[in-house]
């Protein structure tokens, strides 16, 4: 493909993109394909000879699009928004065209410097304290773009781990590092994103998952009590991850309380994960939700969620960039350059060494919309969520399960978890709407998120109409099945007990050390299993770990050591279900039913007759289609 | 017997009918569009397409290395985001005024630093489509095409390299491939999988040892020539990593085994070894056919890092360098370096992904059976949760070039390296510091390291070509990497003239 053809095909792709986004509402939100669908549509090997571009574009429509879940669809209400906008697409296109890799300043100065400046722009707009901004006088902080929030949490936990180990080694110079590592404890709420747990597993440290309050908010007193208890047991608190805007219910941990309590535990790194909600703080009326940020050591938010910026664009700010980079620095000669001391080299700020020119799209978006345009966009989504909340509240059969502060509404039918799971399943299977569940306060709830960039009030009303239609049919059926109801209640009790047991499990320090005895005093032990003799150093408080193959020795790799205990495995899976989707292809359901491994999912069978009914329904015209028809009629005049 | 469909006219107890929406749309503010409308996008896009085409078409004419100093950009743009939207024309104008002065032009034929970072029109256009679809493929259902195209593309790619069937999803076994962002991430993921596997093994043998005791004993290995990301993976993974001394820049099986046996004698637990095919310093190749069997013998996880050179294995004449690949547990190379696929696209295959899935994921497998590979949840195979639709650009590139043209691209670069090497050897002032492999020439002036440092500084200072140095066993040399897809034979002559002219200048100053 030469540049002449690129100009032609590039514009054809632009046309395709415009057409795709303009007619998106005419597609099913979710595809009706089954796993493995694509394998049979594509040849098993790459073509030896070049293929024609037009054939490739036909394949995009015929083979790729049937398998696309349309995240930009006005009826997509799952997860959180996946940012997408024309300026962002073009910024990424320019980044591709320039094609530099910005691991050091010299590798492409504009790549590094635009990132530094744009992160300061965004930090100011959000209202971060000056010490997080790189170019403020006297600041030791700064911002960086990561691939995702998972990496923001991971790199800050790695930095905190490095810092804590360094401090412990200074205090206990003869103790082996593995043993020091076993003392470290991180903390987060039960509502925190699963990436915190994943980061703890990668860092190979213990994570204590704490119970939030009735509003799903982690409180300062809870943190304090947990840390004090752990310190008494000889453990070393080193990291706390708090969430502003949890995935399950968009709840807010109480950052002012937590920050104050952490003043009693110097050396603990406080991270704030505001992946979705952080974007909204560009609106003055929402800045109170950021209260307490001055206590934080790091903060992350994802413009690729709610700021019309395409994935990948997750922004992280730290108070002290040296503490971050010193944990990650590996510095070979071929990456050094003449200005190494004067410039920020972003390869030291993340897991990958190489990095794309991502700041271009953020720069394009911030300029093309302006802060006021982005504020308007966020406020619009919040209004839509409030509108949906009002619709739910008006229907006495439903209830709201979260405080609707931003764009997420958690709701459910009053009644059993099974009833709500059925409702969500039949809605999603219809392909008219796409939502996902979450577990909040031990109840199965349905998450409805205002997602689409150009969503309208009519879209919200239409979504509610769909939900009500399906609920009406489901409730009608349920009224005729009292026996099923009795069985549902029994299953619900079983599931509730399992869930409750698991929640207690993960918050109970006995998981980490079954020998913990709250009533007793900590035992002092002069003996260490390490061959290094600690003669002359202060004794380390260490409790004996009982050898019990049924107990969890530590959080990292716990599943490996308990892989034979399927009941626990099943319980564990419930904990993280909120990240999964409820859409089950038909063959998967049948295969799952025949699966050899028991799981709670198999107990919750799906009713095939409902699916048959759904297939008979004619697709309902969306308001946008009506408007398009009107527009066509107007054009005829 | 089918259930009678419910009718909307059936009355319910609800006072507001069937509960449908009855809030007036007027309650919301009138819809104000803040979006760039499609016609404006088309104009902006056309200008951008033209800009990119002209930029790449005329890239020779730009100075490859910028003349700016740190901090150049700050005075050129405001220190805060604009409150009001700006015109796209203003953003477009700032590309030349603000961005281009600070761009190091990686795709200039005069850029010879690092290794290639691929760039091609099909990949650029595919990334545009990926950006428009804008799905996040962390589970199969989150966008089935995203996952499934990746499965098939990894099989296509694996077959192009003739990887053993155990690595391919289509074999129906455990194995399969995944696109990571970078080789650094592939190396770390492999290390974490290896760690999980070894911990479980040791735990079964020594139930009385706690996992942190075991962790303290784990040790991994790599050549002293391995990429810095390998050392970093050890740092991040919290394990010791031993550097094994290479012989002619290549790690031999005997040296690896000696290191392993020494560590075992000291009570340590070897668990992981990285074999590099195509080192960054000199594009040297570890003896995989020796190191692999040694690793298997001692039950280590063998990870093969072929980040740059892996692309060359689509050419049969270079596959002998992969000999021993069947002994590996994981393999990685970067199509975004040399296969005309834009960054980020790092291909990784695993013989048994379950160790990676179990190593650091919090959502364990529901069923204990071998994964069929049709619909993996790729979020378990990587560090981030979210992922872009990267398979599209691989698909576009492989189809629009076809394997034969990609092979031709590889061969052309290898010939250019040989051409430059011949020019060096013909000049008695210069010597080769290492064997010429693939598209990399390692050369230096005969004499001291200081002379060569001065030479490099002078070459780069002229701004006409861009090289970086490397050092092996205290010998400093210059690396000439063939990077750009626009490079012609005349460009190699030009680059040689630049090197020679800089050397001439130095001689005249003495």
Swiss-Prot record, chain B:
Name of protein: Aromatic-L-amino-acid decarboxylase
Renumbered residue ranges of the record's region Disordered: 1-28, 358-384
Residues bound to substrate: 117, 227
GO-annotated biological processes: adult chitin-containing cuticle pigmentation; anesthesia-resistant memory; catecholamine metabolic process; dopamine biosynthetic process from tyrosine; long-term memory; regulation of adult chitin-containing cuticle pigmentation; response to hydrogen peroxide; response to wounding
Record flagged with keyword Lyase: yes
Protein family per UniProt: Belongs to the group II decarboxylase family.
Tissue occurrence: Hypoderm isoform is expressed only in hypodermal epithelium and the CNS isoform only in central nervous system. Expressed in the adult head (at protein level).
Phenotype reported upon loss of the gene: Simultaneous knockdown of Ddc and myc restores increased dopamine levels and the induced male-male courtship observed in the single myc knockdown.
Positions annotated as active site in the UniProt record: 227
UniProt keyword Transcription regulation present: no
Bias (Polar residues): 1-17
EC number: 4.1.1.28
GO molecular function: 5-hydroxy-L-tryptophan decarboxylase activity; aromatic-L-amino-acid decarboxylase activity; L-dopa decarboxylase activity; pyridoxal phosphate binding
Modified residues (N6-(pyridoxal phosphate)lysine): 337
GO terms under cellular component: cytoplasm
Source organism of this protein record: Drosophila melanogaster
Induction: By ecdysone. In larval epidermis, expression is rapidly induced. In adult epidermis expression responds to a pulse of hormone and there is a time lag between initial exposure and appearance of DDC.
Effect of residue 197 to N: In allele Ddc-R9
Source superkingdom: Eukaryota
Subunit structure: Homodimer.
Amino acids binding pyridoxal 5'-phosphate: 183-184, 227, 305, 334
EC top class named in words: lyase
Keywords: Catecholamine biosynthesis, Decarboxylase, Lyase, Pyridoxal phosphate
């Amino acid at each position: 493909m030469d540049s002449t053809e690129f100009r032609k095909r590039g514009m054809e792709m632009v046309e395709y993109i415009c057409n795709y986004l303009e007619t998106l509402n005419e597609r099913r939100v979710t595809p009706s394909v089954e796993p493995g669908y694509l394998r049979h549509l594509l040849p098993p090997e790459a073509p030896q000879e070049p293929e024609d571009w037009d054939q490739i574009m036909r394949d995009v429509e015929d083979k790729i699009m049937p398998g696309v879940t349309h995240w930009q669809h006005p009826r997509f209400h799952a997860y959180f928004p996946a940012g997408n906008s024309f300026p962002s697409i073009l910024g990424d296109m320019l980044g591709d065209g320039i094609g530099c890799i910005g691991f050091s300043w010299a590798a492409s100065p504009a790549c590094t410097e635009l990132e530094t400046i744009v992160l300061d722009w965004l930090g100011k707009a959000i209202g971060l304290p000056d010490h997080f901004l790189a170019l403020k006088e006297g600041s030791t902080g700064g911002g960086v773009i990561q691939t995702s929030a998972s990496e923001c949490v991971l790199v800050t936990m790695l930095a905190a781990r490095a810092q804590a180990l360094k401090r412990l080694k200074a205090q206990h110079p003869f103790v082996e590092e593995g043993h020091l590592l076993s003392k470290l404890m991180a903390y987060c709420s039960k509502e925190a994103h699963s990436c915190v747990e994943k980061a703890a597993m990668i860092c190979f440290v213990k994570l204590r998952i704490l119970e939030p309050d009735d509003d799903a908010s982690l409180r300062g007193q809870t943190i304090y009590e947990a840390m004090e208890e752990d310190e008494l047991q000889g453990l070393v608190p080193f990291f706390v991850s708090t969430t502003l805007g949890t995935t399950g219910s968009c709840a807010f941990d109480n950052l002012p309380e937590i920050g104050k309590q952490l003043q009693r535990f110097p050396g603990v790194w406080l991270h704030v994960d505001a992946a979705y909600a952080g974007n909204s703080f560009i609106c003055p009326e929402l800045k109170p939700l950021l209260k307490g940020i001055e206590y934080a050591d790091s903060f992350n938010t994802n413009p690729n969620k709610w700021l019309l910026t395409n994935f990948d664009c997750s922004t992280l700010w730290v108070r002290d960039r040296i503490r971050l980079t010193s944990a990650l620095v590996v510095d070979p000669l071929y990456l050094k350059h003449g200005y190494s001391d004067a410039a920020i080299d972003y390869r030291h700020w993340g897991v990958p060494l190489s990095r794309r020119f991502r700041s271009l799209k953020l720069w394009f978006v911030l300029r093309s919309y302006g802060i006021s345009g982005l504020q308007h966009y966020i406020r619009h989504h919040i209004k839509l969520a409030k509108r949906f909340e009002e619709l739910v509240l008006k229907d006495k059969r439903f209830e709201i399960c979260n405080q609707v502060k931003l764009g997420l509404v958690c709701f459910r039918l009053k009644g059993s978890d099974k009833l709500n799971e059925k409702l969500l399943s039949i809605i999603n299977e219809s392909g008219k709407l796409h939502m996902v569940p979450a577990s909040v306060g031990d109840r199965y709830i349905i998450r409805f998120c205002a997602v689409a960039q150009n969503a309208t009030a009519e879209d919200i009303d239409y979504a509610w109409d769909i939900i009500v239609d399906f609920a009406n049919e489901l409730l009608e059926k349920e009224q005729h099945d009292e026996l099923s109801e009795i069985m549902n209640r029994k299953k619900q009790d079983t599931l509730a007990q399992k869930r409750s047991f698991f929640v207690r499990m993960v918050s109970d320090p006995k998981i980490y050390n079954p020998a913990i005895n709250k009533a007793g005093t900590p035992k002092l032990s002069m003996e260490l299993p390490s061959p290094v003799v600690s003669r002359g150093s202060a004794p380390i408080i260490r409790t004996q770990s009982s050898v019990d193959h049924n107990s969890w020795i530590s959080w990292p790799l716990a599943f490996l050591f308990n892989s034979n205990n399927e009941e626990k495995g099943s319980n564990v899976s419930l904990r993280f279900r909120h990240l999964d989707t409820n859409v089950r292809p038909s063959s998967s359901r049948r295969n799952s039913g025949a699966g050899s491994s028991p799981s709670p999912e198999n107990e919750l069978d799906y009713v095939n007759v409902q699916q048959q009914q759904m297939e008979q329904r004619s697709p309902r015209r969306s308001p946008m289609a009506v408007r398009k028809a009107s527009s066509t009629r107007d054009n005829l005049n | 017997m089918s259930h009678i469909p419910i009718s909307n006219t059936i009355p319910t107890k609800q006072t507001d009918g069937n509960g449908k929406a009855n809030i007036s749309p007027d309650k919301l503010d009138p819809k104000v569009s803040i979006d760039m409308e499609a016609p404006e996008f088309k104009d902006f896009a056309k200008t951008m397409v033209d800009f990119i085409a002209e930029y790449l078409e005329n890239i020779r004419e730009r100075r490859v290395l910028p003349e700016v100093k740190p901090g150049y950009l700050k005075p050129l743009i405001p220190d805060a985001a604009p409150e009001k939207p700006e015109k796209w024309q203003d953003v477009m104008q700032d590309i030349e005024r603000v961005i281009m002065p600070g761009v190091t032009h990686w795709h200039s034929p005069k850029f010879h630093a690092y290794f290639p970072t691929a760039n091609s029109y099909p990949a650029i256009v595919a990334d545009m489509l990926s950006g428009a679809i804008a799905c996040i493929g962390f589970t199969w259902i989150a966008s089935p095409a995203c996952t499934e195209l990746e499965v098939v593309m990894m099989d296509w790619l694996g077959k192009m390299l003739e990887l053993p069937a155990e690595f391919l999803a289509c074999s129906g076994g455990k194995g399969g491939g995944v696109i990571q962002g970078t080789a650094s991430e592939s190396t770390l993921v492999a290390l974490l999988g290896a760690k999980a596997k070894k911990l479980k093994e040791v735990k079964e043998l020594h139930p009385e040892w706690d996992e942190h005791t075991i962790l303290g004993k784990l040790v991994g290995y790599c050549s002293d020539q391995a990429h810095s990301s390998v050392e970093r993976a050890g740092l991040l993974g919290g394990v010791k990593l031993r550097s094994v001394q290479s012989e002619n820049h290549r790690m031999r099986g005997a040296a690896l085994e000696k290191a392993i046996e020494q560590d075992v004698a000291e009570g340590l637990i070897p668990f992981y070894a990285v074999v590099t095919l195509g080192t960054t310093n000199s594009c040297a190749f570890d003896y995989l056919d020796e190191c692999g069997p040694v690793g298997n013998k001692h039950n280590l996880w063998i990870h093969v890092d072929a980040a740059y050179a892996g692309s060359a294995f689509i050419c049969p004449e270079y596959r002998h360098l992969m000999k021993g690949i069947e002994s590996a547990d994981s393999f990685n190379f970067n199509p975004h370096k040399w296969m005309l696929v834009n960054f980020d696209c790092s291909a990784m295959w695993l013989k048994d992904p379950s160790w990676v899935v179990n190593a650091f994921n919090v959502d364990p497998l529901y069923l204990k059976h071998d994964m069929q590979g049709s619909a993996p949840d790729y979020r378990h195979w990587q560090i981030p949760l979210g992922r872009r639709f990267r398979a599209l650009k691989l698909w576009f590139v492989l189809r629009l070039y076809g394997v034969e043209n990609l092979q031709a691209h590889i061969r052309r670069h290898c010939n250019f390296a040989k051409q430059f090497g011949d020019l060096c050897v013909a000049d008695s002032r210069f010597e080769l510091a290492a064997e010429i492999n693939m598209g990399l020439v390692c050369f230096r002036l005969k004499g001291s390291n200081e002379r060569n440092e001065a030479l490099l500084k002078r070459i780069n200072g002229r701004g006409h070509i861009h090289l970086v140095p490397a050092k092996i066993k205290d010998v400093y040399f210059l690396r000439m990497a063939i990077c750009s897809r626009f490079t012609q034979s005349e460009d190699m002559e030009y680059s040689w003239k630049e090197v020679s002219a800089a050397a001439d200048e130095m001689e005249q100053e003495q």
